[in-house]
Every structure is written in C-alpha cells, then in structure tokens.
Amino acid sequence: MKCLSLTALKIKTKEDVMEAIEKIKEELKGKEIELSSLDKDRTALFVVDMVNGFVYSGALASPRVAAIVENLAELNKRMKGYKKVFFLDTHNENSKEFCSFPPHCIKGEEEAELIPELKTEDSEGEEIYYVEKNSTNGFHAEGFKEWINKYEDTVDNYIITGCVTDICVLQFSLTLKSYFNEKNKEKRLIVPINSVETYDGGTHDGDLINLFALYNMHTSGIEIVDRIK
C-alpha cells in the first residue's frame, strides 16, 4: 500500500498545510466495494454507537452523526442475514469516562438505546449481537470478546460503521487491525466514508478531524472506501 508522505511535502506554510489536506482527500476518495463481492458467510457488519445519545438527544448528540442515519439504515437493510454487531455506549452514573466527557448514555435511559432506524423487527435467523460498552473502545467489551472468540476464524471481512470516526470507530478499528496483525491473520477491515461521522465543537472541526481519522486508519492498513455498493 502506497501512502502519502507528509514529510516529503516539507510543510512550512499555511498553503503547504492546505495542499497536504487536499492530497489526503485525493488519496482517500474514489474507492467503492460491491457488497456482492464479499462472501456473505465470512462478512460481518459492525455499527459503533448509533444510539440516541449520539444522534438525537443528549450532551453528545450531533447533527453530523444524524446525517449518516439514512446511509447506514440502507446498508443495514441490504445486509439482512449477515452477521452483525451493534455497539451500544452504556454507562452507570459513576463511569470513569465522565472524567473526560459529560454524562451520557446512562444504562436504562433512552440515550443508551439503538436508534429506531436500525432496529429490525424481522431478524429471525440473523446472527446479531448487541454489545454494551463502558469505554470508547468496543474491542475491550465483554460482549465483543465473546463474539471474536466465536467468529474469529470464520469471518474475514469486517465492515465498520458508526460514530464517532476519530474516537470510538478509530480506536476499535486500529485495535482490531493490530490484533490480527499480531496473530499474522489476513483480514479485511473496511470503513465506508458515507457511514461514519464525527461532531463539530470548539477546536474540534468535524471535517478536518474526520479526514485525519480516516487517513490514520488508511495508513494502518484499513480499507477506506466511499461506500459499499
């Protein structure tokens, strides 16, 4: 995999920075994957934290995240019958994470529930896991440990979606990739740009941070595509 070298660009001025950003955008865009090209029995969909508290209501809800709901719901529908994991950010009132973030997604409250657009009534026969997580990295959740122990040898393609790109999606993706690298296992991790998003707030510019997170994953061997066709 050939990746853009920011060192080679010799960034010194604001114009150099803008040029580097445009080169990153160019490197990431224009790739698509046909869902039909992936073996259904060896492919799984991961949806990170598409809960009410990050989409519709609460201290961490973002309209940017709400904007990907339609794309994600459509992908979820097309992947009926595939293995799926829905990560649900879920905390108690004394969560250590609240030292870094405002209280959110308290267990038993509406914020911690999966958004209605992704709830599937007709799920009989589907292998769906709903994994509650108490940290920003779903890899460490007990429910995911159970899933990976069961499916590690039979799933080769991991489609990772959800929010937010630079925190929970990034941490899970990089940890999963390094986990497989450590074991010398060939697995495809795929992140569709139209199905991940982050937030705007203060110095956290959503467009810029989203781009840097995608590029971070790209340089780590994760496939970044415009969408899953």
Specify the residue positions occupied by each region the protein language model found.
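Short acidic, Gly/Ser-rich segments with clustered Asp/Glu that frequently serve as metal-coordination loops
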Residues: 50-58
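A short alpha/beta connector and helix-capping loop motif
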Residues: 41, 45, 58-91
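Active-site-adjacent betaalpha module
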Residues: 1-44, 92, 103-229
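Short glycine-enriched, charge-decorated loop/helix-capping segments at active-site entrances
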Residues: 58-65, 100-105, 134
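Generic enzyme active-site microenvironment
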Residues: 46-47, 51, 87, 192
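Active-site nucleophile/metal-coordination loop of metallo-enzymes that catalyze phosphate/sulfate
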Residues: 85-103
